[in-house]
A protein has these predicted regions:
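Non-catalytic interaction modules of co-chaperones and other macromolecular assembly/maintenance factors
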Residues: 1-160
Length: 160
């Protein structure tokens, strides 16, 4: 990265894996020293632009992994895009709910000290305008679920 300070271009090396708000020091490019002392260092505050797919938690990258209702119920093998442009094939376990985490080891941010993982969080997606066949299948599924109450303990847990 090249920045201009006082009209002069200065090269700044941004290390891999730098976090938002961290500072990079450029030795000898700060203000002149007093009484003939050495020139000070320039500190550059880094702002990391948010990514449309990935967010960062420590050295881990986190993303939503859209899956269909049938993939969540039955399980599926899907490709996940990696930040380096490659893909990783992962298994969505049968019975996954939204929020289920699938970890790809070594798919996160690499720093001088460690490499994080990519965490793909299952995000069940339903069609905005389901067709007649999907509605019919959903009604059959509702009947098959019988008395299943997925919110049975919600009110009690909310009071704790």
């Amino acid at each position: 990265l090249t920045i201009k300070v006082g009209g002069s271009p200065i090269k700044v090396r941004i290390p891999a894996g730098i976090k938002d708000g961290q500072k990079v020091r450029v030795k000898g490019h700060g203000k002149p020293g007093t009484h003939g002392g050495p020139t000070g260092d320039l500190e550059v505050a880094v702002t990391v632009k948010p990514h449309p797919v990935y967010s960062r938690e420590g050295n881990d990258l986190v993303m939503d992994l859209p899956v269909t209702v049938s993939e969540a119920i039955l399980g599926a093998v899907v490709d996940v895009p990696m930040v380096d442009g490659n893909t990783a094939t992962v298994k969505v376990p049968a019975g996954s709910s939204s929020g289920t985490e699938i970890r790809v080891r070594g798919g996160g941010v690499t720093t001088s000290k460690a490499t994080g993982d990519l965490i793909a969080r299952v995000a069940i997606r339903v069609p905005e305008k389901p067709g007649r066949e999907l509605k019919k299948l959903a009604k059959e599924m509702a009947q098959a679920e019988g008395d299943l109450d997925v919110r049975a303990t919600l009110a009690e847990a909310a009071q704790e």
